[in-house]
Design a protein with these regions (language model features):
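C-terminal helix-to-coil terminal segments
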Residues: 2, 95-110, 118, 124, ...
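Phosphate/diphosphate ligand-binding glycine-rich loop within oxidoreductases
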Residues: 49-130, 144-145
């Protein structure tokens, strides 16, 4: 990298003055330009021509011919599946990094919250409160499923799954995890200090994805944190739910496309699942006519688990760590394998 050449960064994310200063103070060569308009054709061509680094929430990207100097795209989201088919990402000299790890703290808390709510029958008690109804058989019907002594299965042991495992450790739960490469239990992606499980210390057993059905049979709770790819589309179908332990609970914070909604509803109605929590859906916003809304043992939230007042600062922390690496010609954190989809 030329020690004198300007490094032109374009952000389509609105930055605070403090965030802007943090980025620009890294190196005298850095120049940041902020355009709030996320539509590529509304950003001047001369800006695109000189852009070397793009900080964006996407999903729309500029045409290949507009960005001859672009070398790196930093997405503010963990999931970049909506960008993967863009011709720009087929260029060998352009790499994209996601924000995996940046928002794990709040997502871990969300998962723990839903596990506790489900296990302690909170949906049933909230419904009774709305009806002003005292639950007379409370001792028998509201027996909790405690996390302590329970087995929790985490499907997808990336940054989110690892933070869930770390938080579960304090509750005394047995953690089973499933990932694609079980021979590499360590996490080489971005991990904020004191969070996650970078060294693979918080799971009790690790399963390859091919052995997922066997893992599910042992789990009182199952948490889905896999990325959406062609191979994970509708992963949780009738056959997969039928392999789950009777009376278990299911939480999805990944993508709605990984779950067959009809199969989930059948599992809830049959008692195979005692309850579930969904933060993501195949269609968002979730249509009012969706039968999911009517399930009494289902918690629905509007794709909110990653959000926090600190969310953008967390993304900028990651971007700065990656920018330091970029300046030193070191490998970046969270480089997305376009062929794999994550």
């Amino acid at each position: 990298m030329d020690a004198k050449q300007k490094i032109e960064i374009l952000s389509t994310i609105t930055l605070t003055e403090e965030q802007l200063n943090r980025i620009q103070s890294l190196d005298d060569r850095i120049k940041v330009e902020v355009h709030k308009n996320k539509e590529p054709n509304k950003i001047p061509d001369e800006v695109w021509r000189k852009t070397e680094i793009l900080l964006t929430s996407g999903p729309n990207l500029p045409a290949v011919e507009k960005v001859p100097n672009l070398r790196w795209i930093q997405s503010s989201w963990t999931g970049v599946d909506k960008m993967l088919d863009d011709p720009l990402l087929q260029q060998k000299n352009v790499q994209i990094t996601n924000s995996s790890g940046a928002n794990v703290s709040q997502m871990g808390e969300y998962v723990i919250m839903t596990l506790l709510m489900l296990g302690h029958k909170m949906p049933q008690m909230i419904q009774a409160q709305r009806e002003k109804r005292w639950i007379e058989d409370r001792i028998s019907s509201l027996q909790p499923k405690e996390l302590r002594g329970s087995t929790v299965g985490i499907v997808g042991y990336g940054s989110i799954g690892r933070e869930v495992a770390r938080q579960l450790f304090a509750y005394g739960a047995t953690v089973l995890a499933s990932k694609r490469e079980v021979m590499h239990p360590k996490d080489t992606g971005y991990t904020p200090e004191s969070l996650g499980d970078p060294n693979g210390n918080y799971f009790h057993r690790l399963y390859p994805i091919e052995a997922l059905k066997g893992m599910l049979e042992e789990c009182d709770f199952v948490v889905l944190t896999l990325p959406h790819t062609k191979s994970t589309e509708c992963l949780f179908d009738k056959e997969m739910f039928d392999n789950m332990k009777p009376g278990s609970y299911f939480v999805n914070v990944s993508r709605g496309q990984l779950v067959d909604d009809g199969a989930l509803i059948d599992a809830l109605n049959s008692g195979r699942l005692a309850g579930a929590a969904l933060d993501v859906f195949t269609e968002e916003p979730l249509p009012s006519e969706s039968p999911l809304w009517s399930q009494p043992n289902l918690i629905i939230t509007p794709h909110i688990s990653a959000f926090s007042p600190n969310m953008l600062d967390q993304v900028i922390d990651l971007f700065i760590e990656n920018l330091k690496r970029y300046l030193l010609d070191r490998p970046l954190y969270n480089v997305v394998n376009v062929e794999l989809g994550y």
